[in-house]
Amino acid sequence: MKIYNTYSRQLEDFQPIEPGKVKMYVCGPTVYNYIHVGNARSVVAFDLVRKYLEFRGFEVEYISNFTDVDDKIIKAAASENISTKELSERYIAAFYEDTDLLNVKRASQNPKATEFIEAMIDFIQELLDKDYAYISEGDVYFRVAKSKDYAKLANKNLADLLAGASGRTDEETNLKESPADFALWKSVKADEVSWQAPWGAGRPGWHIECSVMSTSLLGETIDIHGGGADLEFPHHTNEIAQSEAKTGQKFVNYWMHNGFVNVDGEKMSKSLGNFTTVHELLQVVDPQILRFFLTTTHYRRPLNFTDDALTEAENNIKKIENAYRHLDDQAESNLSALTTFRNDFVAAMDEDFNIANGMTVFYDFVSWVNKGNGGAEVKAFFDQVLEILGIKFEIEQSLDSEIEAMIEERQLAREVRDFAKSDEIRDALKAQGIVLEDTKDGVRWHRE
């Protein structure tokens, strides 16, 4: 199995620290609003990675955090005249509601930043003791000049990174030894949530939170760290700098970053205002369709969010569901053909989780199933791929029985040449969204 490591910009053989086990950390949302489709792309992309690793036999310890203390949370809470805790808990609940509908497997743990404040203070104190950090008027900053290969993850020089970074780097430069230095701790401002530290009251900076939560729960070196491509700098760059300064160990063995969701060629983001929240979208779009849209493009490629793309996803799901519902798990099949499908799917996915190539194999498999191939092993592989994709087809047994009874009644009508009755039953089923297909092997049905 190979993973594209952002740090080296190369495909690398995957060798976990402990054979058979994977320690994985993915940056979660800052919970001041509902997640948008761009956020969901990251959640779904790494859910697919996790599920495929489990399919391949790995035991995955999967950690994804909630940033529940942040400038944006403080501002949003103040605008509603509520506490930051009340605001963040609201949007944590909404996150679970949305991602459950998208069939995202719950993380092994979802730590909150506010649960690790003491550990963050200890982490910062150690950086101060090692002279990697300094105090300036109650703030604590990291000395970037002491960090070896600081800009390597983003594959740019430091000047370019600072010029292209987001507003997260717009800190009080007059308090810093160098404009490149970043905040580990921000001193308290009036009426803001704060905690007491040896250097004064305040709250942690954004970057320190993920370093502390990941190393506290997974150890000093982890196998895989994931997130959106926009996190390469400054967030992940700064995580590496502070973590390796503290521990003296390599922080992450494989860095993975998913591509953006674009609207009219621009990255979907709250700051641009061109975002659609998942909460809103799921009022009008089936969660399965959104999940399929987000899942079936290779995770590193950008996605263009359009109505046509959602329609294509819907049509493809219908084809897959139709094959799945008519798969006869008692049928006989050529198991060597099944083995070929399985091996080809694994070969595609083993190349940096290339689901786009994997889907090409899977669509061929679906066509093969539609030719009458079935059996328990065929159904088992079908189920495994659906699990990786995060797609579930609910089998409505009572409705299926009713439909089968009507089909049988129609067949009897045809045998006695009562075509008016036959057409009446066909029309009644069509009104329920059920389409009949008369084939040489009998009648089949599927939902429109």
From Swiss-Prot:
Residues involved in Zn(2+) binding: 27, 210, 235, 239
UniProt xrefs under Gene3D superfamilies: Cysteine-tRNA ligase, C-terminal anti-codon recognition domain (1.20.120.1910), HUPs (3.40.50.620)
GO molecular function per UniProt: ATP binding; cysteine-tRNA ligase activity; zinc ion binding
Entry's Gene Ontology cellular component terms: cytosol
InterPro entries attached to this UniProt entry: Cys-tRNA-ligase (IPR015803), Cys-tRNA-synt_Ia_DALR (IPR015273), Cys-tRNA/MSH_ligase (IPR024909), CysS_C (IPR056411), Rossmann-like_a/b/a_fold (IPR014729), tRNA-synt_1_cat_dom (IPR032678), tRNAsynth_Ia_anticodon-bd (IPR009080)
Known cofactor(s): Zn(2+)
Protein name per Swiss-Prot or TrEMBL: Cysteine--tRNA ligase
PANTHER family tied to this protein: CYSTEINE--TRNA LIGASE, CYTOPLASMIC, CYSTEINYL-TRNA SYNTHETASE
Entries under NCBIfam families matching the protein: cysS
Residue sites binding ATP per the record: 270
Motif ('KMSKS' region): 267-271
Family: Belongs to the class-I aminoacyl-tRNA synthetase family.
Highest taxon, organism lineage: Bacteria
Motif position, 'HIGH' region: 29-39
EC number(s) from the headed UniProt entry: 6.1.1.16
Keyword Nucleotide-binding: yes
Organism of this sequence: Lactococcus lactis subsp. cremoris (strain MG1363)
CDD domains recorded: CysRS_core (cd00672)
